[in-house]
């Protein structure tokens, strides 16, 4: 069967060109790979020939998307432990150094530094030092535990010549709540809503979670895959554009904002939890705010919801993080089918160690103010229409989405960048007695640096 990019793929029944694609595609693109322990290495190339030999050697340490999917299936059946993940990405400068034809996405060609003004990012001079330098490649080494990652790191280092330098390094460390769901440092379930590219994953979502009646998570392959132009056969060899951004979270500041908002709105007792939910769009346990006024619907965390019953923003504010970055057909600027095309496969991981429980009832002063955050990672088929669109046109745009009364909701309170103003909230869930907060929600997430990469096919790496 040929590779049909216009729909989802059943990997178990894939044959012909579709099977070849899976055998030559890197893991973690179509389906997330476990990476509770993650090492990220940013590399520079000093000698093109040695860099090519190094990349060729890395291909021998990598597994295919198909192998990863088979490991996941085996783990479900027998609890068999899979192999660690090694992902490889190249920047436009890396391609130029290798003397190889690079993918043509204009944002990729320009690089992340060129997007600073567009995305309202901090100036490059304010980024952490290694992100200010020229980066040619990224390696992702991930697994459920630290041991396999250390072993894989040693194998990578054994292949690395002196002319391939480690420009910088990051370490990811997964966080989970008492229910075992992954959370970010503000304490909220993260990564629950994802575009699903595999038919088997869509079926599992329908049959084993809260369903797919109000929100269909399926997405066509063309939303994440592009032909690999430098591979031996781009009709069956595919890759994906990869965004990496280090986002530091000031947990203390965010928890102060939650406290102050609850005070401004006169929320009492357990209803004070709704203050944070109005910023995020979900309660800490993942319960969607548009679905109910209190936490508790978390087994499993729900994703089958829309904003059709909340068209006035009386339950979940229009500016809540998850409503801004996935309006679920309610944004008002585009037809729902066009709006969906901006969604991307997010593969982020938290970083930084802390001594407090993110979900404990503690005063803000006991929360970390720096050195923790999110290593934001996402796969795209079009950087300008997915990641950059989401950040610039949705999160940073005070006029999006479009409420019926024509008002401006304001920035995404979590990841929005730009001038902030006080925003409106419903002191009573589901009622139209809107009140305005006294002060703007402070920016508690700071971008510390990043880059754009292309994750090529295994066939390309072997051909070097």
Swiss-Prot record:
* Keyword presence, Heme: yes
Matching entries from PROSITE patterns are given as:
DYP_PEROXIDASE
EC class: oxidoreductase
Activity dependence on pH, as recorded: Optimum pH is 4.5 for the H(2)O(2)-dependent oxidation of Reactive Blue 5, and 5.0 for the O(2)-dependent oxidation of 4-methoxymandelate.
A GO cellular component annotated for this chain's UniProt record is:
cytosol
Extract one GO molecular function annotation from the record: manganese peroxidase activity
The chemistry this enzyme catalyses reads: 1-(4-hydroxy-3-methoxyphenyl)-2-(2-methoxyphenoxy)propane-1,3-diol + H2O2 = guaiacol + vanillin + glycolaldehyde + H2O; 2 Mn(2+) + H2O2 + 2 H(+) = 2 Mn(3+) + 2 H2O; 2 a phenolic donor + H2O2 = 2 a phenolic radical donor + 2 H2O; Reactive Blue 5 + 2 H2O2 = 2,2'-disulfonyl azobenzene + 3-[(4-amino-6-chloro-1,3,5-triazin-2-yl)amino]benzenesulfonate + phthalate + 2 H2O + 2 H(+)
Q: Tell me the active site.
A: 203
Keyword annotations from UniProtKB, A to Z:
Heme, Iron, Manganese, Metal-binding, Oxidoreductase, Peroxidase, Secreted
The cofactor binding remark recorded in the entry reads: Binds 1 heme b (iron(II)-protoporphyrin IX) group per subunit.
Q: Where does heme bind?
A: 321
> What subcellular locations does the record give?
Secreted
Cofactors (names):
heme b; Mn(2+)
| UniProt entry tagged with the keyword Secreted | yes
Q: What is its EC number?
A: 1.11.1.16, 1.11.1.19, 1.11.1.7
Q: Function of this protein?
A: Displays both high peroxidase and manganese peroxidase activity. Is likely involved in lignin degradation. Also has a Mn-dependent oxidase mode of action that expands its substrate scope in vitro; is thus able to catalyze the O(2)- and Mn-dependent oxidative decarboxylation of 4-methoxymandelate to anisaldehyde.
Q: Which family does it belong to?
A: Belongs to the DyP-type peroxidase family.
User: What NCBIfam families has UniProt attached to this entry?
Assistant: Dyp_perox_fam
Under what name is this protein listed? Multifunctional dye peroxidase DyP2
Q: Which gene encodes it?
A: dyp2
